Amino acid sequence: MPRAKGGFKSRQRRNKVLKLAKGYRGARSKLFRSATEAVDRALNYAFRDRRVKKRDFRSLWIMRINAASRLNGLSYSKFIFGLKKADVQIDRKVLADIAITDPKGFAEISAVAKAQL
């Protein structure tokens, strides 16, 4: 029985990695070993940054809410505390959107929060 070296499957596996590395600079898109390292690193960064993105957006929303609430005479922490006491259940994403698109509406929400303090 002749020896089977698994050439087809090996080539398939290499081509899969090289396809993922398409568009990388230099040897990283041409040579299997360099491509493997680059793809592994890229996938690790992608995995990590999908989680970091959530933190970054939340901090962006908080910055926007803080800036808008300070225009209405409240700090961020007092604004959020006032909303919690008033039982207003609007999340930070929506509050940040209102702060940018509808400043008058945000001023009304700030008035509700201020009344509870």
UniProtKB/Swiss-Prot annotation:
The keyword 4Fe-4S does not apply. The gene is rplT. SUPFAM superfamilies: Ribosomal protein L20. One of its GO terms (molecular function) is structural constituent of ribosome. Pfam families: Ribosomal_L20. This is Large ribosomal subunit protein bL20. It comes from Trichlorobacter lovleyi (strain ATCC BAA-1151 / DSM 17278 / SZ) (Geobacter lovleyi). Binds directly to 23S ribosomal RNA and is necessary for the in vitro assembly process of the 50S ribosomal subunit. It is not involved in the protein synthesizing functions of that subunit. Signal peptide: none annotated. The keyword Ribonucleoprotein applies. Gene3D superfamilies: 6.10.160.10, Ribosomal protein L20. CDD domains: Ribosomal_L20 (cd07026). GO terms for biological process: ribosomal large subunit assembly; translation. Belongs to the bacterial ribosomal protein bL20 family. InterPro entries: Ribosomal_bL20, RIBOSOMAL_L20_CS, Ribosomal_protein_bL20_C. GO terms for cellular component: ribonucleoprotein complex; ribosome.
